[in-house]
Amino acid sequence: MVVVDWLGLGLGSVAGALVSEGLKVLISEAKKVLAFKSVSNELASTMESLLPVIKEIESMQDGMELQDLKDTIDKALLLVEKCSHVEKWNIILKSKYTRKVEEINRKMLKFCQVQLQLLLFRNQLKSMPSMEAILNNYFQNINKKLDRLSGSPAPPLVSKRCSVPKLDNMVLVGLDWPLVELKKKLLDNSVVVVSGPPGCGKTTLVTKLCDDPEIEGEFKKIFYSVVSNTPNFRAIVQNLLQDNGCGAITFDDDSQAETGLRDLLEELTKDGRILLVLDDVWQGSEFLLRKFQIDLPDYKILVTSQFDFTSLWPTYHLVPLKYEYARSLLIQWASPPLHTSPDEYEDLLQKILKRCNGFPLVIEVVGISLKGQALYLWKGQVESWSEGETILGNANPTVRQRLQPSFNVLKPHLKECFMDMGSFLQDQKIRASLIIDIWMELYGRGSSSTNKFMLYLNELASQNLLKLVHLGTNKREDGFYNELLVTQHNILRELAIFQSELEPIMQRKKLNLEIREDNFPDECLNQPINARLLSIYTDDLFSSKWLEMDCPNVEALVLNISSLDYALPSFIAEMKKLKVLTIANHGFYPARLSNFSCLSSLPNLKRIRFEKVSVTLLDIPQLQLGSLKKLSFFMCSFGEVFYDTEDIDVSKALSNLQEIDIDYCYDLDELPYWIPEVVSLKTLSITNCNKLSQLPEAIGNLSRLEVLRMCSCMNLSELPEATERLSNLRSLDISHCLGLRKLPQEIGKLQKLENISMRKCSGCELPDSVRYLENLEVKCDEVTGLLWERLMPEMRNLRVHTEETEHNLKLLLTF
């Protein structure tokens, strides 16, 4: 073990004279720790920059005032000694000690920033000509390190409850006794499965258990993960590690992931008991559960599944609600209709509850559909249930049978939209803008606006067939729905798919294909697919070796991918009716796409959306997509933005492109050359791109631009002066651009500008020319509002709306 022998070095008599020797030992040892190369080298670099100043102080005094630094050196040496015994593959200990090394580095820098400067002034070292060069160089290095340290994210806060969903203060009915029974079974067994039919409240019960004070006291940490019917062991373990503050970690195979999981659990159980909740486990996933079974005394697993695993693990069977609880729940959702006698109301309740069969989800859906409705609609609902057999289920009533009437009462256009929801993977939080893009092309007629299809989403949500989740409290009214998520209960997604599958597979208007490894469905290879909406899922073992498929009528294609490398299928080139293409990656890292050339021959392709993929922006104009109207990127990686390498007339190559949407693309630091050359562009949205610091002056070439949206680009310092040439600009959104210091000097020339949104922009200077903006509406926070209120006497038509915005970014973790 390496320690500094301070007495041996003479520190007992001349304390400060040998602190530099201790620093030399620490620098030498830190450089030897290969498993922590980046952080140990950073620590060594900090100490090397400190060494010459310490030597100068030692030469002028006894150095007793360096005792704090000596103590830090002692701690650092002990930590370096521990790090030297950590193997490269031990990601848990590496993560743990990395944070500790970073903390030591912070202490060193803090000493340099405060205490060292006091010592220098006290000893008047700064006034000595011999020290001027040393100190200038030293403090320049320290300032750079402090800037870099302040710009890097702080060590993550690790919650006791990782990813456990919230119950949103919902009044829960009939779960008290099941909770007591489940707690007892869990405390008596290492693995417990909560089993029951879809929609009976399994997830709600388990979430309530995680909130229980006795359980919170019993377990030091609770992990929660949704498994679903497309389980990915590596992704689940990666998320568990990330929830515990280990950062982004890649596993080459499941064996590495198993080792990482064991290391994590062994480390955490040293501090207390651990509970892992695996929600929505499907039949056939027994192998997955066994990988999570690790023989540790303080580790338990709780599973929810609609399938019965009694033969493998202790199981708690959750039964439907008893009548009194079901009745109470229904009354919560649907109050009595007007002009109803107590007896008549009770009779209706009994008939409805008999149909609902005690399933909480069915009660909720039916209750919502009847809420506020007239008596005759209640009676009509009950009568419709008594007419003939339902097309769902079998001899025994199922949840789908209970949900079918809620689908039957939908208007025709809402039925189509509801069935479209089956094209997305389960347990997904889907951007409303993605769904609206598809509906615009499938059901839009000429001048149809996004508002029409947003209304469709609201109608489905009002009947509890899906849920809308706002990332912020401010609801968009300008057709921008990136901050609106759509979620759907799995059983409702199953209902949507069930409706689509009532026709023979080759005749369906909506078709979902699932390709695991390289196994293609046989029925899709020998005859044409007639679907308008085609969704293809491929797992992370898919090799991109496509077989030919004939899809002449496909207008909307959704590719749900999982592999790190993915080639677009060549048969896309023959989809001459294709209007909208969505490529959504559900893997942990951006997928590398190839074979873009298959898109260049599509005469009707109007919308392309990329999610979590790696693309080269220069590829886009080379495709010559003359019919393209909207191009969207979400959580994409672009790498280096290359400049023009070929002679491409962008105005012709993308002659109809009207909207570009770039959101949460973290490595975008500048716009590609071709965007300002898309003269047809009407809407440019660049949001949550924190590396972007400026826009090019060429942005002024977009003479048709009507909407410029730059929300939450933290490092954007200014808008180019050429912005004044955007003569058709109606709306400007710079909300949460915290680094923005000024608006263009001649912004007042934008006479068509009607709206400016600038929440959290109190440091932004308003030029005098804003006074010339007539009929302007400003949306901002209270502090920013003060900048505008001073102008109200001169701007009689100015309208300032102050509001606060809150964002729940945890909702984005599944993307």
UniProtKB/Swiss-Prot annotation:
Gene3D superfamilies: Helical domain of apoptotic protease-activating factors, P-loop containing nucleotide triphosphate hydrolases, Ribonuclease Inhibitor, Winged helix-like DNA-binding domain superfamily/Winged helix DNA-binding domain. It holds the Pfam family RPW8. GO terms for molecular function: ADP binding; ATP binding. ATP binds at residues 196-203. One of its GO terms (cellular component) is cytosol. LRR repeats lie at residues 656-678, 680-702, 704-726, 728-750. GO terms for biological process: defense response. InterPro entries: Apaf_helical, Leu-rich_rpt, LRR_dom_sf, NB-ARC, P-loop_NTPase, Powdery_mildew-R_dom, WH-like_DNA-bd_sf. Residues 1-150 form the RPW8 domain. The LRR repeats probably act as specificity determinant of pathogen recognition. Probable disease resistance protein. This is Probable disease resistance protein At5g66910.
